[in-house]
Design a protein with these regions (language model features):
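Conserved donor-binding loop and adjoining core beta-sheet/short helix segment
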Residues: 1-2, 21, 29-84, 187-202
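Short amphipathic alpha-helix that is part of the acyltransferase structural core
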Residues: 1-26, 117-157, 269-270
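A conserved beta-strand-loop-helix scaffold within acyl/acetyltransferase catalytic domains
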Residues: 32, 58-60, 153-205
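Cytosolic beta-strand hydrophobic patch enriched in CBS
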Residues: 42-47, 176-180, 235
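Acyl-donor-binding surface of acyltransferase catalytic domains
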Residues: 59-128, 261-263
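Conserved acetyl-CoA-binding loop-helix of GNAT-fold acetyltransferases
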Residues: 71-77, 206, 212-226, 249
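Conserved beta-strand-loop-alpha-helix junction that forms the acyl-donor binding cleft
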Residues: 90-96, 235-248, 254, 260-267
């Protein structure tokens, strides 16, 4: 049975996640950042005979799912999702396979993309003076770059993306870095989420006209180095072999396999 979590359930959920929080990073970090009871997130547990089978955290148009044994009710999850404007489900690969295997595309068309979660503990120091923190005036260009990207952009609603980036930046939950040429942003990367001791780096993108010139490695190394110096664990998600190779060049090692379920109906689109 799925129950909505209350404030006094926080320690129960954290205990269930335990030290393997890298298997549900966004769920864990949003929980730490906002806390149960916040208007920003909704948190639920699937419980059976007083045992937790799964945890669900709703944030904007995403639901983050974590289950240790994938012994939860997909039918009940589907009913819960009907009450939320969900476009994506993020979870471990095995959980995505379990949900997808019990979710008919005739009910709601979807695609599943598999990838990896990786961590970096050390990065080679390189010359990267061109990397700088983004200014408020850069965000319009950043949103346009991300939304226009053939891989990254398809996971976002444009207005929601802009809202998330600005909100996270103002709250200190993320930092955006850019490389610019003549005041035009040609490369971007950010900490997509940060809490004490942990950060996720994400949204690495380079303008098509400037690709394969080393800018991706330059900005990726710079942001990783900056965050590692602060004593934080640094993680990243990726879904393509090209991105996988780039991460290995920088020094990332994989800690788990990942899955992203994207519903194809366009009711959320601009």
């Amino acid at each position: 049975m799925i129950v909505k979590c209350k404030k006094n359930d926080e320690q129960i959920v954290e205990s269930y996640i335990g030290k393997e929080y890298y298997k549900c990073l966004y769920l864990y970090m949003n929980l730490q950042r906002y806390g149960i009871g916040s208007q920003v997130i909704d948190v639920y547990m699937d419980k059976r005979e007083n045992e937790i089978k799964a945890v669900y955290l709703f944030y904007f148009s995403c639901v983050h799912v974590y289950s240790k044994d994938n012994d939860f009710s997909v039918l009940e999850l589907k009913e819960l999702i009907k009450d939320h404007p969900i476009k994506m489900i993020y979870c471990e690969k095995s959980t995505a396979e379990y949900i997808g295997g019990n979710y008919s595309s005739s009910e709601r068309p979807f695609t599943i993309t598999y990838g990896w979660v990786a961590e970096i503990t050390n990065v080679d120091e390189k010359h990267r003076e061109s990397v700088q923190l983004a200014s408020a005036n850069d965000f319009k260009q950043i949103v346009q770059m991300i939304y226009g990207d053939e891989d990254i952009g398809k996971s976002y609603n444009k207005n929601e993306l802009a809202e998330q980036l600005l909100q996270r930046s103002k709250e200190g939950y993320s930092r955006n870095y850019v490389i610019k040429k003549n005041d035009v942003v040609i490369a971007h990367a950010c900490t997509n989420a940060e809490i004490d001791g942990v950060a996720i780096v994400a949204e690495l993108i380079v303008n098509k006209e400037y690709r394969r010139r080393g800018y991706a490695l330059e900005i990726w190394r710079a942001i990783c180095e900056e965050v590692l110096k602060e004593g934080k664990r640094v993680f990243s998600f990726y879904y393509s072999n090209e991105s996988r190779n780039l991460h290995k060049k920088v020094g990332f090692h994989e800690v788990c396999e990942w899955g992203k379920i994207v519903f194809n109906n366009n009711y959320m689109e601009v």
